[in-house]
């Protein structure tokens, strides 16, 4: 993660692979399913560099991207990238919350669709399911420890709860309403914030007034979100 290191440049110039249209570094047989890094040593190596690697006319990663974040070759529009937003500490825009769908963490559509990486799918993608209710019932620190290999903004497990709320609201079950209502009493303003949106998403926004003390709410972030959602309801009537 150090910008002073030219990992991608060294990777390509050493003949290990090439940069795909998804912006991922690809290798024959592995595709994008790899991590690259540098080891600096006081020795020179002669390397026969192959420069004939390329994606050619393939654009499956661009076709598979659910938001159009890869519409331009070799450019990733992070503002449209689901994986970026699920790891961001910033407020996720309303349109992106919709597009996140049932995803809890990350989005691998561009990796899964990449032909050179088909052999890595079975190896790296075994069990991708999570229990969203379990996530929401866990303490923040428990989540940080449980998913310690994840990048979690500010090492705050409430961001994982945020992701779970969005996924749950986009794919509600019979108990989703009660789950979201219970979260309105959370001590975390982040959890309360997205729970309000979650109830709006499943058509239960009017119940927020019964369980959330809006008049005495001190969080400006929550008050603004409540007002915004309220205006969206009336603008659609």
Predicted region positions:
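Flexible internal linker/loop segments at domain or repeat junctions
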Residues: 127-158
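Short inter-helical turns and helix N-cap capping residues of alpha-solenoid HEAT/ARM repeat scaffolds
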Residues: 157, 187-188, 216-222
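Amphipathic alpha-helical scaffolding segments comprising HEAT/armadillo-like alpha-solenoid repeats
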Residues: 129-132, 142-146, 173-185, 204-215, ...
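Catalytic cores of enzyme domains
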Residues: 1-132
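Structural detector for internal amphipathic alpha-helices that build alpha-solenoid repeat scaffolds
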Residues: 161-171, 192-202, 224-236
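Alpha-helical scaffold segments
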Residues: 118-122, 219, 223-225, 229
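Alpha-helical protein-protein interaction scaffolds
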Residues: 180-184, 188-196
């Amino acid at each position: 993660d150090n910008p002073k290191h030219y990992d991608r440049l060294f990777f390509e110039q050493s003949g290990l692979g090439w940069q795909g249209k998804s912006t991922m570094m690809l290798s024959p047989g592995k595709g994008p399913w790899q991590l690259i890094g540098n080891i600096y040593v006081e020795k020179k190596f002669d390397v026969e560099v192959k420069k004939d690697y390329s994606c050619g006319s393939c654009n499956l990663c661009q076709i598979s991207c659910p938001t159009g974040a890869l519409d331009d070759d070799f450019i990733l529009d992070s503002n449209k990238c689901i994986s970026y937003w699920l790891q961001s500490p910033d407020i996720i825009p309303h349109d992106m919350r919709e597009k996140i769908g049932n995803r809890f963490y990350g989005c691998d559509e561009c990796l899964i669709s990449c032909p050179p990486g088909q052999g890595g799918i079975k190896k790296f993608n075994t069990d991708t399911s999570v229990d969203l209710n379990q996530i929401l019932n866990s303490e923040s620190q428990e989540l940080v420890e449980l998913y310690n290999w994840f990048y979690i903004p500010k090492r705050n497990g409430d961001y994982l709860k945020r992701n779970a709320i969005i996924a749950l609201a986009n794919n509600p079950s019979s108990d989703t309403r009660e789950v979201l209502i219970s979260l309105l009493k959370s001590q975390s303003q982040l959890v309360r914030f997205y729970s309000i949106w979650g109830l709006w998403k499943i058509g239960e926004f009017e119940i927020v007034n019964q369980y959330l003390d809006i008049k005495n709410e001190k969080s400006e972030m929550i008050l603004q979100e409540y007002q915004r959602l309220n205006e969206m309801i009336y603008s659609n009537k």
